[in-house]
Regions:
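Short Gly/Pro-enriched loop/turn and capping motifs at secondary-structure junctions
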Residues: 87, 112-114, 131-135
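Fe(II)/2-oxoglutarate oxygenase catalytic core
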Residues: 1-69, 74, 85-88, 135-155
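Conserved metal-binding segment of the jelly-roll/cupin
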Residues: 98-112
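A short beta-strand-loop-beta hairpin characteristic of the jelly-roll/cupin
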Residues: 82-101
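Short, surface-exposed charged micro-motifs
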Residues: 55, 79, 114
């Protein structure tokens, strides 16, 4: 999509994935054992080839991630700021909040959201998935089964 043109194959926005679309990247997980220990204590979705996702998201100075949406609300996304200089912003829907180090923002990423680093310094956020707490265990299993069936059908 044209909205991503400036960031495609650009070091201006990068991610260090621990989990990527449901696949653990073991050699990266061992590099952040405390982070992984904490994430593994949380109710993460386990939907084959979809979730969980966990990463350090790095946004270079004077860089904007354009408005975008996720594709599934069976999960919520957590943004936990780790390195947050002044003049960084994050918007979900019509709500913009001030970042506070150590305070997570949990949201449904099917709602349009964007991030801005208007500072002269690097911004780092830990991003990871959680099961949507409104889903009962039976509904979670239906999400897994439906996703697996769709993957089998589409190849």
């Amino acid at each position: 999509l044209d909205q991503w043109r400036e960031l495609n194959k650009s070091p201006r926005w990068s991610a260090f994935h621990f989990y990527d679309q449901g696949r653990e990247i073991a050699e990266r997980c061992v590099r952040a054992p405390d982070t992984m220990r904490a994430i593994r204590l949380l109710p993460q979705p386990d939907v084959a080839l979809r979730s969980p996702t966990a990463m350090f998201s790095v946004l270079q100075p004077k860089t904007r991630i354009p408005p975008h949406t996720g594709v599934a609300n069976f999960r919520l996304v957590v943004h936990l700021p780790l390195v947050m200089p002044p003049h960084c912003g994050f918007r979900v829907g019509g709500e913009t909040r001030e970042w506070r180090i150590g305070e997570a923002w949990v949201f449904d990423d099917t709602i349009e959201h964007e991030a801005i680093n208007d500072s002269d310094e690097l911004r780092v956020v830990l991003i990871f998935d959680l099961w949507n707490p409104h889903l009962a265990p039976e509904e979670r299993e239906m999400v897994r089964a439906m996703t697996a069936a769709a993957r089998a059908y589409t190849g």
